[in-house]
Amino acid sequence: VMLTGQQPVVQPAWNIFNKGIAGGEETERIEFLQKNGWEAEIPAISEQEVTIPTEWDEVYAGYASLQQAQGFNLEKLRGKLVTEYTYHITNYPENDDVAAHILVYKDKIVAADISEMQQGGSCTAVIPG
């Protein structure tokens, strides 16, 4: 809530939460994972530039919804080039073929997920909630 002198203005949760989670450095990305209960191998398995689609199909809309639930807003990043870092997660229950994907834009984490890498595997939030 922001006070404007008249009526309080309610800010969306993602706007308050995601003022910027540092992610430009590998140590920052690993710390982000650890703070949320995940252990990852260093260095990243991969680092690649990806573009957030301007038009979202049903799958990407679901991914954006998962990110929104964690406090991230991909809506404002449509068409933007981001860097995707992929880390092998070592403490996922009953599955060792699991990766964390962290999207970084202007040195800030803008999206993250934990994915089972086999065909049909699940994609879940990094941030518990």
Could you describe each region identified by the protein language model?
Residues 95-129:
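A short, surface-exposed interaction/processing loop segment used at functional sites
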Residues 35-95:
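Mature extracytoplasmic domains of secretory-pathway proteins
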Residues 1-62:
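N-terminal export/targeting and maturation segments
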